[in-house]
C-alpha cells in the first residue's frame, strides 16, 4: 500500500508534519531528509543549480610502467674519474747574501744644502740713518737692578762628551740577536694520495653483540562496557514546551489580489498626452540631389612643392665663433729661491688651441635633383567609384496608430488555481492511517470515486 504523509501531499511547500525530536524506539533503514534547515528554507522547483566549473577527468592514465631512464642519464654518460694531483711546494733555499739595513728613506733621500733666503719685504726707508738712537726704555728708567749675588745653578755639570769617531749605526738589538738562517723542518703530515681499501665494512657493532632480546609481555586490552538503554520512557518534554503551550488559531488569510481584474478587459489606449499636445508637422518631400560625375584632369600631376620650388642651396661657410679669447693673468716671477723651486722648475705653459671638428659635409655646386622614388615609380590611376549599398529613403513616416495587443495577451491562457490538499484538516481522497515514530502523519488513498470528486474542488472551498 502506497502511503503518504503531509510532507508528500503538500504542493506549495508550506505544510509539513509535526516531527518529533528523536526516534530511539524504532530501527528503520529508511533515511529522514527533514531538518531544521529544510523546514525554514524550502526548495524552489523553478531554480536550476548552476553547472560546476570543476574540470572533467578527461585525462586517463596509461597503465604502461614508467621508464626508469631520465634525460640526464640518457644524455650524460659516465666518465673515468682521475684522482686530483696536489701541487707540492718547492723547498725554500736560504739566500747567501748579507742583509743590508738600509731603509727606504736612506736610499731615496738626497741631501740638499740649505741657503739663507733673501728678505721678501722691502725696506720702509730707502735712505738709512747712521746716527745712533739715544733713549732709555721705561723699564730701565723705573726699575733699577738690586745689588744681590747671583744664585748658583742647580743644573748638573755636562759630563757627556760625544765621541770623535764615526757612528757605526749598530743597535743593541742587532748585537744581541744575530741573523739566523731558516731551518728545514721535517713534515709529518700524511700525503694526499687516495686511500682505497678493499676490505668490506663489518656490520657487527658492540650493541648487536651485547644485546640480549627479552620476550614481550602481552598487552592487556580493556573491553568497554556495553550500552544499556534506560527503562524509563523518554517524555521529550523540554522547559520551552512545558512553559509555552501552542493555541489552535484560525488559518492566516491571504492578501494576494484576485487574478481576474475587472479593468483588464478594456483595450489599452494608444493615444498619450504627448501625442495629443505635439502633432506631427507637415514636412515636404525631400528630393535627393543628383551627384556631379567626376572628370579627371587630362594633364599629369605636378609633385613639386613650394619649398622645392623656392629653396636654393646656399654654398656658404659656417659661421665663426664670436666668443672672446680668454687671456691668462701673467705676473712677475717671485724673487726668491727655495729648495723646492730649484728642484722643480716652471714648465713652459703653452696655450692649447681649441679642438675643432673637421667639416665632413661638403656642399656640391651642382643644382639639387628633385627626382624621388615616388616620382620615378608612380603610375596615375583613374579613381574607382564604389557602389553604395545604403537603402533609399522612403520619405517621412506615416502616423500609424500603435497596436494595443502584445504577445503575452494573445498567447496567455488563464489556468485554474487549485488549493493545496495539505491545507485541509483531512486531505481529500486520503484516510488517516497512523503516526510513525518520527512524527509523520501517514494517509492511505481512499476509493477511486471519492478521490476523483475531491480533486475538482475550487479555491473558495473551505
UniProtKB/Swiss-Prot annotation:
Q: Where is this region: Mn 7?
A: 233-266
Q: Where is this region: Mn 10?
A: 333-366
One Pfam annotation, family name? Answer: SAXO1-2
Biological process per Gene Ontology, one example term = positive regulation of cilium assembly
Q: Where are the annotated segments for Mn 5?
A: 166-199
- Region of interest (Mn 9), ranges: 300-332
Q: List the keywords (alphabetical).
A: Cell projection, Cilium biogenesis/degradation, Cytoplasm, Cytoskeleton, Repeat
Query: Record's InterPro entries?
Result: SAXO1/2
Q: Where is this region: Mn 3?
A: 98-131
Q: What are the boundaries of the region Mn 1?
A: 30-64
Which proteins does it associate with, and in what oligomeric form?
Associates with microtubules via the Mn regions.
| Protein name (record) | Stabilizer of axonemal microtubules 1
In its UniProt entry, the species of origin is given as Rattus norvegicus (Rat)
User: Per UniProt, what is the name of the gene that codes for the protein in this document?
Assistant: Saxo1
